[in-house]
Every structure is written in structure tokens, then in C-alpha cells.
Amino acid sequence: MKRRTFLLGAGAVATAAAQPGFRLVDVTAAAGIHFRHNSGAFGQKFLPETMGPGCAFLDYDGDGWLDILLVNGMDWPGHKQRKSTLRLYRNNRNGTFANVTERAGLAVEMYGMGVAVADYNNDGHPDLLITGVGQNRLFQNTGKGTFVDVTAKAGLGGRSAFSTSAMWFDFDRDGHLDLFVCNYVKWAGEHDVFCSVDGKHKSYCTPEAYHGSTCWLFRNRGNGTFEDVTAKCGIFDTSSKSLGVALLDYDHDGWPDLLVANDTQPNKLYRNMRNGMFEDMAVRAGVAFSEDGKARAGMGIDVADFDNSGRPGIAITNFDNELMALYRSTREGVYTDAASKIGIGQASRNSLGFGCAFFDADLDGYLDLMAVNGHIDETVRHIHSNVGYAQPPHLFLNDGRGNFRDVAGEVGGGFAAPKVARGLAYGDFDRDGDVDVLITTNQGPAYLYRNDVFSGNRSLRLRLVGTRSNRDAIGAVVRVFTPDGTQSRMVKTGSSYLSQSELTLTFGLGRREKADRIVIEWPGAGVQEHKNVGAGAYNCAEGKSISAQPRV
């Protein structure tokens, strides 16, 4: 998170446009979400205090309604004043949530950072990986509304690091989900570095003050345990300072690849060589550095086919004055940062971005882009008068013609109010067919925004269930064909920053009443096709016919 200033060309000029056909309504209090992040801050300005927390949408009890998990920190040893734990909220199916943390066995104190959700043992129940400072924790879902800590039993214990984002994926396509964990820098409270803006008072350090730390890759043995294959697979790299990770198929070979956002170090694009090894392609692909060849402060990340070209684009949030990156595939295997040309670059100049996500907010068939922002230094205005500590989010609406317009201030609900935001996740918690938003803030509350689409646009929602491939179908690619074009989505964990969105895929149909054709490419190489599928929500099991979900 280096403080640098770039002078880049002007971005695209937005023309007059119609008001968005949706509103984001703040329903946090009405929904019963009462949470405040504990960073443990006590005046010493330890680096981890300013980095968290993450959040997740998940259906932990399998009732078909999305629940909410919020990651929390804790007081530092020797300065304990209160107990703070993870927070799990169960969806009451009426717009409200109940705090079931204690009942679920998650009232655990740890200095948490991020969360990754997936059914790693293929038993039909989503499990939790919570990252943090110290030891990460793996909680297995019992299927009875509770979780048990299986960290040591699974072979993930005995490691201490400053872990951030994480991702479940099946890199060897054996049907068992493997685990990738981002690690940030080598940090310990007893070795904290003194950094200062004025030479007198301690401030939060930027990562240049610390050595990097390698990410970890764990292979799922299929028996409930994991093997550390970081070095064996070519991932080991102690120069990295990793904060975000996203899943993609970079070379369109059907094998999952990895894109890692690094802070003040080159980003990494790990291409799956299909033999248990990965090769870093980031420099060759054009995503390692900024356009002028410098490493930026990459935080949040997402990958999606935002222009319906069939090729995934890449969004990465960066430090203020570095501009948010939006990489577009210009030729096979090569990307160019188009952010400044399509309305995102200059709009994000004064933002320090964290969580980001592509989703179709207005259900028009084109993926929009949300980014949440907030500085790490509460005194930043004394240094840069145009940069605030609390910052408004961005909601870039995709016009379908290659341009984006920030409509955060036009969607109501106080959405554009400045926040010291970190985590971002999306999911349809009220089952009305559009995608709602969950945001966490550093040393502050969480926010739940209900999306109300009033334009008349419809959606097609698909929940995939693997039978031969991993049960969550992570890595599956779905293509939806309508007369307006072809949309493609991948089922994925990870992405954003420290957070996890729902695994169900949402396709905007606009005013169309159906999709002409749906093609599902499963992670195990099988392909299914369904024709004339009407708007609505469906379950799609591998090798079986599509079935409509019960109406609310």
C-alpha cells in the first residue's frame, strides 16, 4: 500500500444516462444485524488492525435461504477488555436474521481476517475456513446446525502466519476441493516496526516495512486431510504480499488457474500445467504491473466475463492515486488495463479500494462492478486533502457498450455514505431473484443492502450440484444464450477481499422471459445442455435434468 501518485490520461466522459432501474435499501437494523468489528486497537497501531474484516453469504443449514457470517478480530494479549467472536446469523426467511453463533459452535475467539466457504468433504454441507493472524481454523459442518473445529485433524494446524483471503478449488480435478491461502507479510506484535508520518507519532506501516510471505496450497487427499504441496506445485514465493485471490481458466483448457493480487509486489497469474505444477504467467499476460511497469498495491480482485465476449476480464482494487485496474483480454493470453478508457480509472483515483465484485445489479444481462473503499490511516487528510479516511463505495453500471458509470449516489439507501469498508459479498438473501449486498467495515458495523429491481427485468438463477465433480461444482462454467447474446459465469469461491459470495449463479435476462439454451461445462469435463429455460431459480445436478426451486 505504497503512497504514490500517477498522472494518467483522462477517462471516458459519461454521457447523460437514465436512472438505474433498482435501489439498494439499507436493511441492516431491520434485519437484526448488530455487529461491530473489533480490531483490537489500543494505540500501538499494529498492522493487522487496519486490514479486516471479511464476510460471507452461505446456506449453512441447507434450508435454501442464505445466512450471513461476519469475521471478527479480538483484543491483543495483555490488553484484553472484551470478548469478540465470529458472528453467524441464520436467515429467518422473513427479512430478519437470528444470531446463532453460540448454538452453532462458532463463538470462538481468534484474530480473524477472511473466510472461504465450500463443502470440502462432499457431504452436502458447507464448511468454513477462517483465516487470521496466527493459526487459521477449519470448521466442519456437522449437518445438524453446528460446526466442529477440525484444523488439527485435517492437517492444517501447526502453522502461524498473517493470512488474508482464501479459496477452495479442485486444481487436480479429482473431485475433492483443494485449498489456496493468501499470506500477507511476516509480522508479529513483538517485532512490530515503528513507522511515522511526522517522525514523532506512530502510524500504521505500509507493507514495504516487512518481508513478504509465501501463499500456501493444500491438496485434499479425499479422506478429510490435506497435504501441503506449495513447494511441489511451484507456488512457493517468499516475496509475495498477497491479499486477494480469484479463480479463472486463463488458457481455456478446462483446468483451474489462479490470479493473486499482491500489495506492492507483482501480481501472480498461476497457470495450471495439468501435471500438478503451476507456472507464473503474470508478466507475459500483462497483469503483473501497472501500465508504466510498477507494482501496485493490489487488495481486492474479481474475474468475470463483463463484456459477454466469452473471455474473462479482471478487476483489481489498489491504493489511492494508483487507480483501480480493469484488465480486458486484447488477444489470446494477453490483457490490457482499460480502466481509464471506460470510466473506471479516474473515478477511482481518490479511493483506496478493498472488496470488489462483478454482478448484474440491474439484471440487464451485463455484469456491473462494485468496489468498497476506505483508507488505512485516519489522519490521511493531513497528508492528502482530497483523500478521506471513510470513503464512498463505487457501483459502476455497465452500459453494454463497453463503458461504465458510477451510480453509487443514485441508488438510494445511504449506499454512497463514506465508510471505512473492507469486505464485500453478494447473494440473494430474500430470494426475490436479484442480488443483495453485504459490506464490512474496519472497527465499525456491517451493512446489509437489499436490492430492489423495479425495472421489470428478470433473472435466471442456477444452483449447480456436482456428482462426479466436486459437490459445489466449483470451476464449472455456465453459458446462457438469448437473442441478446451469450453470458458466461464460473462457479467460484474466493474473489473480492477476505470474503465469499453465494455460489448460485445469477443471469440477468432483461425483459426476456426465457433463455433459449443453457450449456454447463462441469469441472470433470462433462457437458450438459438445457433448452428453453424460463426465468426463475433452478437446481442443476450433474448428469440429471434441471429442476425448478420451490417458489417463495
Where are the language model's segments positioned?
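Twin-arginine (Tat) signal peptide motif
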Residues: 1-7, 222
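N-terminal export signals
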Residues: 5-19
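Short loop/turn motifs that recur once per blade in beta-propeller domains
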Residues: 23-36, 41-47, 98-110, 150-162, ...
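Gly/Ser/Thr/Pro-enriched helix-cap/hinge segments flanking short amphipathic alpha-helices
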Residues: 41-42, 344-346, 381, 385-552
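Beta-propeller blade termini
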Residues: 52-62, 112-122, 164-173, 177, ...
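Hydrophobic beta-strand segments that make up the repeating blades of beta-propeller
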Residues: 68-72, 127-132, 179-183, 258-261, ...
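Short, conserved, GDST-rich strand-edge loop motifs in beta-rich repeat architectures
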Residues: 72-81, 185-209, 372-388
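Asp-box/WD-like beta-propeller blade repeats and closely related beta-sheet repeat scaffolds
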Residues: 105, 111-116, 133-135, 140, ...
